């Protein structure tokens, strides 16, 4: 949540809970939350800001003081009318891809946008069609979550804090 000036919620990190429970953020006292028309988190926290803070974080509210973070509104891929949240699909891929990677959308004449997977690797090649399914066969993906292409990029663009610059890395392919 890059728009916020301080923490507004906490997520339990220990493993003494179900996977579903481990994904839930609980808001701190004197913080209230809601969502806007896009499904993005809206924060009311007078100790943090006198103004209501609207983020680009897609969330699902699970009670008056808890939410499940889904991803970023600005990374959603609309592929053939299906809205795909890359961060949710990436969770499924993290166990089978050892290199750094991310999912993003590229323009597509038929679908509007197509989901593509970028992997940081020196292979400098592209996989598509059956090759993608074979590469990702161990992932538990729905038919819409399979990327149409896999691009291997030698080195991802990064911020000073080593976060992946998704947009500029995507422009490299």
Q: Across the structure, where does each feature detected by a protein language model lie?
A:
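Generic structural signal for well-ordered beta-strand positions
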Residues: 42, 68, 159, 164-165
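AMP-binding/adenylate-forming catalytic core of the ANL superfamily
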Residues: 53-145
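Conserved AMP-binding/adenylate-forming
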Residues: 1-66, 73-76
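Phosphopantetheine-dependent thiolation modules in NRPS/PKS and related acyl-activating systems
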Residues: 163-173
